[in-house]
């Protein structure tokens, strides 16, 4: 499986937060690149893990809180409040401070190297001139998008109220009043709110009996999901494929996410409240309910109808500001919804002493809200006893207070139920705030308002923070969600709980939990509860000797039962095993804190004594006892211990190595540490299990034998088995997150790299397995192709041969031939399909014998097809001839007396008999087929045609006699001859007579004879040529006079409409378009040219197949190499023309005008002629240099063989024939004519292209490899002006390089160019017009001293236009290509901890400028006047140094760069670049926004530095 790139992870995260992503992508991706470059030093993986994922959790919380009160409504902007369509509200990078005005501000997620990213408000400082950053507390996320929040900000500002929020968009920065921003828009329909569900559920769901699961809930109605529900994120399946980069969960320190999102944490929660229950303001939204397992499918994530949250206010027992959760609603989730917790919430571990408020203990020693407090020893003892009771394994818990016993009954009822959280993350622990940068935690908030007050200034989601050295007290039974989830309330249930709950994402998965979760009971000897309660703490500090410091604080009152000696030994050995090898050698320094005079566990001192005496080296190297009074009796006889006071701690360890309680700076969280290391234990077991299965799969693949039977190509079964392993899925999903969380522990610097190394071994093993699987699949494909080849060969020699032989005698009738043709088409299609399969197999493994068999069968197939087509043509001719004769005789027999001559003339004119040439051609065709029946039929057709001609001649002769003339006059007088009048021309049939010497007549175009009244007037003018001096003759037919020049309507004949209808068409005598005869003549000429072209191509292929004489001995080694290169190019031309091009031309025989498209389709192959031109000119120059040495004429010296001159002569023939064909094509066939013109241009370019390639090789003194600079676009001489210098230079324009050279004398008969200067086109800018001559343009370059610029004067306007157009197109193409480079660089390398991305330097990346639509920090490059648009110019920039346009249409970057041609372009009248014949107009100019928009080659595209960067950066030779 391919790894999921980091880019996909980034895009999916942004798409989930800022929909629609296609609108917000330009702005967001630019901000992403900016932060990656400036803050994370181009490490995309670190950016993703350290910034983007925590920021997603934070922003998801903000969005959910903002949308909470609008649950059930359909938002008009689905990304509100983070974005409004393309306008981004919460920025991921800083905006230019110059855009800020008084009263403006914007929101940004600010990265931090020392802690998780945070939300901040940025505005102008009161004095102006700088930006002020106001942190937004995590607690404020609950009411961020409210007017009260901004009012609170404005209260603390001395001057100037903030009122307008800045939004970033592709078009620029937008301003929106905060009052409008915080009010979302909804979609309405017919006066009702779309998506509102007024009748499906009551406002408050009735709660069931305590301890029972909630009743099943109906599904949501379509459209009721809001952005805060988490449904706008793409659904991701939990079962990832191999090394699929899934989202990692990082510890968001201080985040309140899971405090409200985790059900069953505690009975009383401290959460911020907005409005009181008295109804003064808006209420909280309907709460979402979690589903119980077993009530439905595991993927029931859509049925979450709104339900009311807490229906009661704060309980009397809870502290002020806390909301009491009713007992019947213990499974209720406050914030965020179930799926949102599963996707976006970070870890929130609960530490002992961080949750205030017990079940019924009242406030106890707690002081007034908001005042710092210090709890006495008694409360501390109560706290620790309650904490241990909550964490005890096996059900032993501390006695509960009377107020808690009632809740315990509900817990017992719920203890055996499945977990109420089906979709939440395992990190459901409450966590304290971490305050980086200060020496100690901040004090508690000044004020926590009650539920009835208006709004809190600062609230705590995970428990309040307090002042003092570790004075974090718990006033009731504390909870440690150490194993991934706990019971709904109170202490943990007796059932062992897994350390990490399976994350249910999307629609759930079918992974068994028992296969993924490792329960605590799997490690019965490691006392996790002792470490979680703070009894044993590996602080992460070291003493003065460098030993790891371990603190032991005995609980007060002591645990019941106390820990045994073996338990303590095992736990201490486990903590010692976590250290690095060097620290393990030094041993542990154990600090026993007895300042509170707690009773010591009986087994503690013997265990320490044993560990101090045993082992090599001993595990405990130093024992320190911290005490206020005298030593306890248990320690009086203990040897090797040092007794210390609090003042002596400074000489033991530095303050930064000690805990807060000991006067130091460290503040470890035991519960957090235990949770992470339990997950590490699970991770190691997963790694070991996966590693075993992967290695087993590798052995199976390496030992797999080649199958005897054919198998389907696909993923090998061992790999499928590994990928289906739920352990691998869990490892993919959680492994990286666990390792990242392990690094966040205080003791991580002291611990070894065992888990990471094991994780890396799994990564490498999976990579090895994938490589073997890919090799296995390739072998399968090869075997399958070879089997197909064998099957094709067997079919060709068997059924194929039999069917081909059946077409040898196609039949003697037209119907039989047509039926045979249908069968042959089906057979030919099958053969071609099988031949394609066979050639695909031969491409993998060449086999000359098989290839020959295929070629022979294909040739025979073509011969049969040709014979069948000729037989069909012959039979169709016979049928048409018989039909013509039959219709002629029928006309003669059915006509009345005196009309036969007219009918005969019409028949001859309208459908003339086949000419003698056509008969001779058909006779040759019959002889070629070798069919006696066809020859007999040919003779019969000829005899019948001659008989009909004789009959027509006989009737025409009779009508031309005097008797016939008198009969016609009488008939005319009786039928209305008075209508003609005295001036009517006398009709004469002499014009109908055939010429005296009958020559060949044109072949019949069709076989039917049209009625005389319909067709005579159309063809009458061309019946017979008039003699010189005679007036034009006319023929009278039913009231119409038809002369050779006009048609005059004499009557209202019923047939008139037929004439008029036909006259309007292209076949009418005055119809539009080319006349019929002219069109026939044009088609005939086209077919003649195509036939000549095919014959010429056949001769050319035969000539290329002839051997070339070997070169003479007088050739130098260099010339011999050129000779061999020319022969190689000639052989490639022979292969191309013989295999492909000849067949293409033969296929165009019936469609002559398709020849142009045929040439263009093989344009890449015709580029071989440019290479051939280069080699031939080198040979000619070299042979010319050798000729004086032969002391004779050229004939006596070496010469170029005729066989090597033939290819270029063929190019000339192609061009001549195509030009003639272009002249014969009619104007209405515009597309074919354009293709022919482009083909002619293609052929003409090859000669010039070859000379350009030769000139490139003639550049001397250049240390740059010009072959790596892309295609050579142009080469022309220019007058170059640089400052006061003016010189003549030959300039070469490559795709990546601009080179100046000077022409020197011939070297061996060829030109030579001396290298002068070179510049990268990525640093180049263009000004199209300089001066008034119209011949000059300017090229200038960034990163040069004083903006180095060169003015180039062309010899003609055409050359100038060609260069400027190509340079402009080149710069835009580089800009489009830069987008692809950016995407390709963000590629994941696996699931290991290796870096996934190497992004270019800051100076080489400016795609963010394009995506954000802002100027690229004065990276001015090119001002192209051909892209001018109306609009004001950008301020502060000169026309020669403009910055990027304010906006670039996104469509301009979604281009297929391969379609952009490098051919010269022209400018149309509008000033836009119009492509040449071969160009594809796929690249658009920039969006209107400035008078001279710019093209920034370097500013748009950051190319990687080539090996010759130094040669390009500094001039080596003066220009």
UniProtKB/Swiss-Prot annotation:
Biased amino acid composition, Polar residues: 1467-1482
Biased-composition ranges, Gly residues, are: 355-367
Alphabetical UniProt keywords: Coiled coil, Cytoplasm, Guanine-nucleotide releasing factor, Phosphoprotein
Q: Where is there biased composition of kind Low complexity?
A: 314-341, 980-996
Region described as Disordered: 194-237, 253-503, 955-1031, 1466-1519
PH domain mapped to chain residues: 1265-1372
Instruction: Describe tissue expression.
Output: Expressed at higher level in the central nervous system and skeletal muscle and greater abundance in fetal than adult brain (at protein level).
Which purpose does this protein serve, as stated in its record? May act as a guanine nucleotide exchange factor (GEF).
- GO biological process: one example: regulation of small GTPase mediated signal transduction
This protein is called: Rho guanine nucleotide exchange factor 40
């Amino acid at each position: 499986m391919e790894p999921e790139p980091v880019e996909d992870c980034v895009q999916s995260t942004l798409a989930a937060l800022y929909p629609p992503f296609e609108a917000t992508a330009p702005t967001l991706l630019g901000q992403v690149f900016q932060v990656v470059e400036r803050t994370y030093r181009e490490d995309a993986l670190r950016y993703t893990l350290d910034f983007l994922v925590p920021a997603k959790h934070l922003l998801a919380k903000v969005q959910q809180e903002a949308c909470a009160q609008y649950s059930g409504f359909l938002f008009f902007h689905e990304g509100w409040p983070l974005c409004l369509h393309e306008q981004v509200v919460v920025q991921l990078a800083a905006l230019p401070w110059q855009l800020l005005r008084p009263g403006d501000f914007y929101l940004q997620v600010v990265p931090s190297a020392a802690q998780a990213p945070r939300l901040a408000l940025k505005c102008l400082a009161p004095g102006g001139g700088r930006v002020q950053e106001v942190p937004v507390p995590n607690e404020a996320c609950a009411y961020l998008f409210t007017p009260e929040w901004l009012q609170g900000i404005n209260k603390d500002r001395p001057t100037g109220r903030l009122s307008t929020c800045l939004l970033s968009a592709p078009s620029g920065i937008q301003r929106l009043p905060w009052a409008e921003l915080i009010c979302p828009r909804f979609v309405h329909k017919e006066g009702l709110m779309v998506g509102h569900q007024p009748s499906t559920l009551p406002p408050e769901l009735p709660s069931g009996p305590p301890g029972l699961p909630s009743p099943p809930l109906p599904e949501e109605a379509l459209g009721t999901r809001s952005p805060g529900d988490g449904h706008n994120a793409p659904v991701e399946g939990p079962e990832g494929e191999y090394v699929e980069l899934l989202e990692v969960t990082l510890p968001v320190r201080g985040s309140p996410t899971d405090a409200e999102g985790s059900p069953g944490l505690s009975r009383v929660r401290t959460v911020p409240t907005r409005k009181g229950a008295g109804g003064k303001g808006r209420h909280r939204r309907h709460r979402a309910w979690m589903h119980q397992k077993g009530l439905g499918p595991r993927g029931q994530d859509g049925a979450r109808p709104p339900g009311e949250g807490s229906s009661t206010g704060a309980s009397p027992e809870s502290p002020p500001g806390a909301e009491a959760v009713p007992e019947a609603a213990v499974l209720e989730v406050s914030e965020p919804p179930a799926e949102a917790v599963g996707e976006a919430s970070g870890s929130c571990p609960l530490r002992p002493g961080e949750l205030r408020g017990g079940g019924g203990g009242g406030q106890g020693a707690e002081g007034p809200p908001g005042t710092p407090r210090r709890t006495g020893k008694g409360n501390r003892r109560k706290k620790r006893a309650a904490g241990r009771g909550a964490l005890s394994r096996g059900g032993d818990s501390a006695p509960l207070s009377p107020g808690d016993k009632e809740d315990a009954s509900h817990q017992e009822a719920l203890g055996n139920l499945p977990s109420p959280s089906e979709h939440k993350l395992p990190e459901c622990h409450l966590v304290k705030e971490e305050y980086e940068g200060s020496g100690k935690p901040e004090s508690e908030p000044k004020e926590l308002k009650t539920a009835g007050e208006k709004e809190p200034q600062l609230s705590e989601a995970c428990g309040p923070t307090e002042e003092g050295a570790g004075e974090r007290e718990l006033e009731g039974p504390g909870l440690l969600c150490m194993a991934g989830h706990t019971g709904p309330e109170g202490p943990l249930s007796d059932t062992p709980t897994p350390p990490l709950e399976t994350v249910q994402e999307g629609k759930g998965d079918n992974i068994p939990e028992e296969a993924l979760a490792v329960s605590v009971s799997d490690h019965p000897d490691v006392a996790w509860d002792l470490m979680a309660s703070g009894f044993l703490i590996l602080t992460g500090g070291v003493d003065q000797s460098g030993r790891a410091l371990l603190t032991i604080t005995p609980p007060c009152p002591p645990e019941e039962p106390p820990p045994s000696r073996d338990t303590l030994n095992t736990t201490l050995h486990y903590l010692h095993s976590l250290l690095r090898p060097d620290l393990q050698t030094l041993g542990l320094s154990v600090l026993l804190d007895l300042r509170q005079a707690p009773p010591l566990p009986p087994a503690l001192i013997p265990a320490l004594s044993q560990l101090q005496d045993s082992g090599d080296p001993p595990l405990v190297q130093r024992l320190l006892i911290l005490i206020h009074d005298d030593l306890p009796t248990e320690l009086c006889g203990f040897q090797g211990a040092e007794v210390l006071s609090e003042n002596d701690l400074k000489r033991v360890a530095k303050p930064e190595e000690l805990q807060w309680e000991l006067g130091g700076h460290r503040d470890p969280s035991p519960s957090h540490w235990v949770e992470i290391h339990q997950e590490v234990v699970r991770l190691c077991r997963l790694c070991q299990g996966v590693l075993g299965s992967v290695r087993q799969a590798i052995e199976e693949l390496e030992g797999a034998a080649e199958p005897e039977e054919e198998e389907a190509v696909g993923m090998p079964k061992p790999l499928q088995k590994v990928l289906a392993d739920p352990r691998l899925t869990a490892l993919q999903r959680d492994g990286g997150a666990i390792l990242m969380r392990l690094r966040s522990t205080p003791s991580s610097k002291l611990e070894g790299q065992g888990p990471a190394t094991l994780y890396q071994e799994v990564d490498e093993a999976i990579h090895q397995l994938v490589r073997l699987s890919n090799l296995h699949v390739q072998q399968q494909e090869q075997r399958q192709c070879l089997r197909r080849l064998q099957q094709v060969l067997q079919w060709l020699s068997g059924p194929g041969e039999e069917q081909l032989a059946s077409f040898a005698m196609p039949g003697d009738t037209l119907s039989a031939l047509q039926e045979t043709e249908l069968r042959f088409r089906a057979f030919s299609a099958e053969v071609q399909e099988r031949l394609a399969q066979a050639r695909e197999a031969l491409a993998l493994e060449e086999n000359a014998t098989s290839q020959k068999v295929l070629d022979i069968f294909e040739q025979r197939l073509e011969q049969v097809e040709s014979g069948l087509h000729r037989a069909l043509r012959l039979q169709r001719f016979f049928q048409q001839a018989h039909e013509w004769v039959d219709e002629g005789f029928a006309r003669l027999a059915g006509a009345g007396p005196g009309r036969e001559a007219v009918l005969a003339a019409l028949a001859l004119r309208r459908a003339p008999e086949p000419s003698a040439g056509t008969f001779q051609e058909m006779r040759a065709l019959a002889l070629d087929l070798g069919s006696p029946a066809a020859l007999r039929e040919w003779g019969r057709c000829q005899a019948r045609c001659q008989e009909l001609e004789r009959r027509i001649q006989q009737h025409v002769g009779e009508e031309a006699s005097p008797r016939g003339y008198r009969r016609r006059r009488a008939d005319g007088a009786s039928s209305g001859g008075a209508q003609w009048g005295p001036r009517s021309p006398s009709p004469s049939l002499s014009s109908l007579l055939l010429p005296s010497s009958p020559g060949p007549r044109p072949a019949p175009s069709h076989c039917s004879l049209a009625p005389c009244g319909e067709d005579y007037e159309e063809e009458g003018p061309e019946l017979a040529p008039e003699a010189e001096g005679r007036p034009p003759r006319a023929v009278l037919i039913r009231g119409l006079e038809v002369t050779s020049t006009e048609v005059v309507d004499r009557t209202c004949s019923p047939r008139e409409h037929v004439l008029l209808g036909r006259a309007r068409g292209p076949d009418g005598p005055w119809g539009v378009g080319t006349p019929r005869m002219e069109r026939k003549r044009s088609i005939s000429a086209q077919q003649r040219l195509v036939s000549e072209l095919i014959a010429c191509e056949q001769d050319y292929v035969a000539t290329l197949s002839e051997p070339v004489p070997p070169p003479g001995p007088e050739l130098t080694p260099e010339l011999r190499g050129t000779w061999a290169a020319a022969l190689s190019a000639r052989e490639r031309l022979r292969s191309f023309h013989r295999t492909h091009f000849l067949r293409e031309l033969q296929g165009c025989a019936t469609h002559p005008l398709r020849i142009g498209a045929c040439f263009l389709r093989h344009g890449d192959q015709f580029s071989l002629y440019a290479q051939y031109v280069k080699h031939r000119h080198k040979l000619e120059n070299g042979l010319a240099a050798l000729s004086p040495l032969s002391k004779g004429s050229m004939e006596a010296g070496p010469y170029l063989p005729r066989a090597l001159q033939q290819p270029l002569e063929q190019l000339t023939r192609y061009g001549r024939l195509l030009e003639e064909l272009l002249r014969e094509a009619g104007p209405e066939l515009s597309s074919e004519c354009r293709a022919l013109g482009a083909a002619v241009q293609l052929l003409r370019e090859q000669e010039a292209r070859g000379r350009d390639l030769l000139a490139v090789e003639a550049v001397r003194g250049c240390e740059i490899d010009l072959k790596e600079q892309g295609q050579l676009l142009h080469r022309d001489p220019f007058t170059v002006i640089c400052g006061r210098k003016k010189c003549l230079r030959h300039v070469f324009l490559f795709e990546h390089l601009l080179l100046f050279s000077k022409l020197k004398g011939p070297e061996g008969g060829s030109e030579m160019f001396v290298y002068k200067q070179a510049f990268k086109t990525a640093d180049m800018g263009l000004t199209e017009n300089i001066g008034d001559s119209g011949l000059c343009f300017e090229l200038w370059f960034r990163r040069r001293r004083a903006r180095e610029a060169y003015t180039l004067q062309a010899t003609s306007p055409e050359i100038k236009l060609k260069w400027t157009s190509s340079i402009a197109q080149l710069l835009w193409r580089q800009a489009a290509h830069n987008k692809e480079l950016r995407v390709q660089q963000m590629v994941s390398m696996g699931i290991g901890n290796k870096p996934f991305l190497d992004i270019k330097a800051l100076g080489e990346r400016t795609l963010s400028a394009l995506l954000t639509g802002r100027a690229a920090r004065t990276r001015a490059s090119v001002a192209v006047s051909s892209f001018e648009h109306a609009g004001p110019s950008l301020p502060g920039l000169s026309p020669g140094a403009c910055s990027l346009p304010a906006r670039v249409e996104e469509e301009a970057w979604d281009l297929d760069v391969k379609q952009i041609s490098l051919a010269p372009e022209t400018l149309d009248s509008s000033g836009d670049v119009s492509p040449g014949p071969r160009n594809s107009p796929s690249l658009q100019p920039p969006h209107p926004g400035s008078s001279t928009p710019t093209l920034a080659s370097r500013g748009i595209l950051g190319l990687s530095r080539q090996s010759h960067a130094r040669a390009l950066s500094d001039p080596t030779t003066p220009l």
